[in-house]
Amino acid sequence: MEVKADSRYRFNRKKVRESVAKLLAEQNIKQKVELSLMVVGERKIRELEKKYFGEDKVTDVLSFPQMVGKRIPGDEAVLALGDVVVCYPQAKRQALKFNRLLDDEIEFLVNHGVLHLL
């Protein structure tokens, strides 16, 4: 899983990777997957929400399927899932609201996004 995040957005990347691996195993996904995670600010998530979903608002997580129901051409062993985008400031607010650790909230949002790709 590729993780892209500005260095100012601190979270436990290893924990997120392990959590996604566990989730995929629980969903009986045994082959390798291609999955990208982006952790962004409010401006970027608002831009994506408006461009792809027509709403001018900040949201916590977005999912973008790469190849619905298809494998990466030329590599039958890899399943192309797509991209998950998490809004760090929104995750931080939700962690406070629900009395959770920020790492736990980000993990929850990433897993939620991945489930939308399956």
Please describe what each predicted stretch is.
Residues M1-E107, L115-L118:
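An acidic/histidine-cluster motif and surrounding catalytic segment
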